[in-house]
Amino acid sequence: MNHRTWMSLLSLGAFVAQGAAWAQTAGAMQQKVTGPQARYWLGAETASGMAMPGMGGGGTAETGGGLGAMAGMMGALMSGGGVGAPRKSLRLELGGVRTGNPSEARHTVPTALAMGESLSLLGPEKGTPAAERPERDVPEPPDGKAKGRMLFFWGCGERAGPGQPVVLDFEKLSQGVLPPDMRSNINLRAFRQGPAMGRDAGYADWPNRKNSKTVPSQASLVGDHLVQGNFVPDIRFAVGGAHDFMEALSLKQAKATSGAQQLQWNRVPTALGHFATAMGFKQGAGDSADIVFWNASSTKLLGGEQLMGYLPPAETERLVKARVLLSADTTQCAIPAEAVAAAGGGMTWINLNAFGPELNVVHPPRPEDPKVTWEQQYAVKMRLRSYTGMLGDMENLSAQRSNKADEPASRTEEKKEPSPTDQVKNALKGLFGR
């Protein structure tokens, strides 16, 4: 064996040995993680305008879907602020690896929250079944009788982009025919779910069947927090100004000469991105109707109701770069004239969501030595958003209602069952809103 061959073998041996050493080091660097024993999720929302309680957010079936936000709306009315006045809401969800039978906890809050010394979390009554969360999918018209269409538009601008609208015909749908262009051009990621009854051995939340308070308009989350319960270790965390309630959105609209519907809103300092949606109706001939959906994504996205809740900051950043979400600095957008015309001259309902930061606390902190097991006692996640809603072109909506009211009385009386048009609307329940 010559010298060159020996050198090649030595080099190969050194490479293999180095690779084995790297693999051994990588294996040694893999830190073992256990827990957490408890997870605590907080949802802090600021609503304004005609935003619906629990719209795409933290409301759950266990509490009637947005009990805190509803209390906030009622509080605004009672204080004379009106439905459009900014209102805050909280949703607290605590899960543990053991149960308290029943599970109970107390969240000692900062004085700045102005809600007393503490909030009482309560688990479900014994024997209460876990709430089912129905999947949202393209609805099937009842008995194939529904007549009408769903029209999908997307993107800001006075004119609709190419390939719009995507049309879903209910009569064709009843025959099993879907349009070939129903697929969106962006995948929205699924994220780890928070604490919930049936998902955690022990579970308690607030507001609940016994405890519910209106969150005052001046409430602040800033300060030290302590959570103590009969099924979890003590949980301590602090909230700074960067993770306080977000400022309220103020949404305005105007009709452009092109026929587009101009939207404009204020800049919320802690917002990381925005998403807007709109919906409209247009009565067709006979019992048919068109339901029009629009969203602000520059990338083809049908519907988009799933973006009217919370998002992790990393996902917000990804979707801003993908031009699905509007940037934090964007404060205006136009609903294309074609979408407005398809809705009979004006959108009926408009929603705007501002995604905020997220506070994550894990105790104890990760050990610097990777050989030491990271035994997590608890993990806290606080999510923030600000959202608003408004009625669109009221004159157009009133005109359509007036035309419907002008139908002959005899024809109206003949219809003892819901009309096919109403069946289309009923089939939409749970698709792009609650």
Identify the residue ranges that each predicted region occupies.
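Structural beta-strand segments of beta-rich domains
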Residues: 259-263
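Proline/serine/threonine-rich low-complexity linkers at boundaries of modular beta-sandwich domains
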Residues: 233-245
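Bacterial N-terminal signal peptides
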Residues: 8-18
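Short, aromatic- and glycine-rich surface loops/edge beta-strands on solvent-exposed regions
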Residues: 211-235, 345-359
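Hydrophilic extracytoplasmic domains
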Residues: 264, 270-434
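Solvent-exposed N-terminal domain segments of exported/luminal and surface proteins
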Residues: 30-208
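Sec/Tat signal peptide C-region and signal peptidase I cleavage site
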Residues: 19-23
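Bacterial N-terminal signal peptides that target proteins for export
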Residues: 1-9
